[in-house]
Amino acid sequence: MVVIRLARGGAKARPFFNIVVADKRTRRDGRFIERLGFYNPIATANEESIRIAQDRLTYWRSVGAQASPTVERLISQAAKKAA
């Protein structure tokens, strides 16, 4: 099964997450199929905190990829900001 989830990056105490499409059996920060965007939880007011490639997200959902609950929440946040 293919899932859309967060892969952690960044340094200690400075988290940065990539939104990736990966096989469910792989490790959280392991191999992934495609990077769809990023989430920066500690972004300042003048920095972009979330970016998602909507066209690729739509494609992966159409072929059966399921998003994790956290990614679902981030997608809805990004949609609210865009509107």
Swiss-Prot record:
A GO molecular-function term, please? structural constituent of ribosome
Give a Gene Ontology cellular component term annotated to this protein.
cytoplasm
User: Which InterPro entries does this one have?
Assistant: Ribosomal_bS16, Ribosomal_bS16_CS, Ribosomal_bS16_dom_sf
Q: Which SUPFAM superfamilies match?
A: Ribosomal protein S16
Give any single GO term for biological process.
translation
* Keyword Protease belongs to the record: no
On whether Glycosyltransferase is a keyword of this UniProt record, the answer is no
For this UniProt record, the keywords arranged alphabetically read as follows: Ribonucleoprotein, Ribosomal protein
What stretches pass through the bilayer?
Answer: none
Q: Which family does it belong to?
A: Belongs to the bacterial ribosomal protein bS16 family.
Q: What is this protein called?
A: Small ribosomal subunit protein bS16
Q: List the source organism.
A: Albidiferax ferrireducens (strain ATCC BAA-621 / DSM 15236 / T118)
